[in-house]
Design a protein with these regions (language model features):
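Nucleotide-activated chemistry modules centered on ATP-dependent adenylation/adenylyltransferase
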Residues: 1-171
Length: 171
C-alpha cells in the first residue's frame, strides 16, 4: 500500500515501453495482459516456483457475464464473489462501513479511472468532474498520437462534455 503507484506510472511505462507507443484498446487489452496476467504468472513461476495455482477473480455476481475460461492449464480460476452472490451494492456498502476511504465519488470509477471499457457516460463524467484523471488520459493520447477507443479521442469527448450544461444522471 505504502509504495503503490498513484499516478499511473506502470501503465505509462507500458504504453511508452515499446518501440512505438501503443495504447491498449478493446481489441488489444495489453494493460490486462501485461500488468495483470503476465505479471502474476511471472511471480508465481519465477519468484515462488509454483507450477499450478488457483486464481481468485474479482468479478461480482451482477457482472457474471464477464467470466472467461483461461487458456493456461496451470491456472484454475475461481470466482468467490459470484459464488457468494456479491453485487455492486454489497461492495459499495462494505466500503462505506470501512475505515479506509477509496475516495470514489462515482461507483463506476475503480482504480483504472479512464478505462476504455467504461461507458461514454462515465468517461464524460470524468471529463467534467475529475480534471487530473482526464488530463492524464488526454496526455497519453497526445503523446502516443493515438486513441484508446476507435473513433473518439479523450480530447473530443472532453470538448463535448465541457460544452454541455449540468445534468443529473441519477435515478
Amino acid at each position: 500500500y505504502k509504495t503503490a503507484s498513484r499516478k499511473g506510472e506502470p501503465f505509462e511505462q507500458l504504453i511508452f515501453g515499446w518501440v512505438n507507443p501503443y495504447l491498449p484498446n478493446q481489441d488489444h487489452r495489453i494493460c490486462t495482459i501485461e500488468l495483470k496476467l503476465r505479471t502474476s504468472k511471472r511471480y508465481m513461476l519465477k519468484t515462488l516456483g509454483i507450477k499450478k495455482w488457483g486464481a481468485a477473480i474479482g468479478i461480482r455476481a451482477d457482472e457474471a457475464h464477464r467470466q472467461s475460461k483461461t487458456k493456461d492449464p496451470r491456472i484454475t480460476p475461481f470466482y468467490p464473489l459470484i459464488e457468494a452472490n456479491i453485487t455492486e451494492r454489497d461492495v459499495l456498502d462494505y466500503w462505506k462501513k470501512s475505515n479506509f476511504d477509496l475516495r470514489l465519488e462515482n461507483p463506476a470509477m475503480g482504480n483504472c479511472t479512464g478505462c476504455f471499457l467504461k461507458s461514454e457516460k462515465t468517461r464524460a463524467w470524468i471529463c467534467k468532474n475529475r480534471p487530473k484523471d482526464r488530463d492524464w488520459w488526454l496526455e497519453m493520447e497526445k503523446r502516443a498520437n493515438a486513441t484508446f477507443i476507435k473513433g473518439v479521442s479523450w480530447k473530443e469527448l472532453n470538448d463535448f462534455a465541457q460544452r454541455q450544461g449540468e445534468f443529473s444522471f441519477d435515478d
